């Protein structure tokens, strides 16, 4: 069975706060899937291949937090995907400190990033992403969010070292209970993001 090296586990042990885990996630190059093959890599594969996209970074972040007493949670942010208006979903790692929620996030953009633990509940945390969640032409697209998915309770104890893609996690995030953020009437009245916001949304951390 494949396992983490001792020095890797020691490095994880040093990441004692969510902020330090986020710094570590930011240091990992972004996975652009340049060979055209979709992946959902395990934390072990992320380290071996030294890249991660959104859900891969989230799974790694959840695993590292679990080593420090946090449950390994994922939260699915679901975007509009009907008709001509289509956007990407996002996955973050909710964590709770002193009764308040924050989130880890692996993204290549200046938006949809780490959230400090200052939010009273999951919905409040989710809504902090709402105004940053828009297409290149400024249409706001965040529509639903899931209940937190506990990887430790839902999957066997090898998910973090799997050599196979973790499509089961991706599929479970789609299946679990979701909550609508707003009504159709409210959606119809949404204002476009400002030009300067759209320009900021084009800033990237890693180049292809």
What are these regions (language model features)?
Residues 1-208:
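A structural boundary/capping signal
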């Amino acid at each position: 069975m494949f396992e983490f090296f001792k020095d890797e586990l020691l490095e994880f042990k040093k990441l004692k706060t969510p902020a330090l885990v986020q710094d570590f996630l930011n240091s990992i190059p972004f996975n652009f899937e340049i060979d055209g093959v979709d992946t959902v890599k395990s934390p072990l594969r992320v380290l071996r291949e030294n890249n991660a996209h959104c859900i891969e970074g989230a799974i790694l972040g959840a695993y590292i937090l679990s080593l420090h007493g946090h449950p390994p949670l994922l939260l699915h942010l679901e975007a509009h995907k009907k008709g001509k208006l289509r956007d990407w979903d996002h996955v973050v790692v909710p964590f709770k400190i002193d009764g308040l929620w924050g989130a880890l996030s692996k993204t290549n953009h200046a938006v949809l990033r780490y959230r400090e633990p200052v939010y009273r509940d999951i919905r409040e945390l989710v809504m902090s992403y709402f105004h940053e969640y828009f297409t290149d032409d400024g249409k706001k697209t965040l529509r639903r969010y899931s209940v937190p998915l506990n990887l430790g309770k839902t999957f066997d104890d090898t998910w973090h070292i799997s050599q196979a893609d973790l499509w089961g996690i991706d599929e479970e995030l789609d299946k679990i209970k979701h909550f609508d953020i707003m009504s159709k009437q409210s959606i119809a009245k949404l204002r476009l993001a400002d030009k300067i916001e759209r320009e900021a949304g084009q800033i990237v951390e890693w180049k292809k």
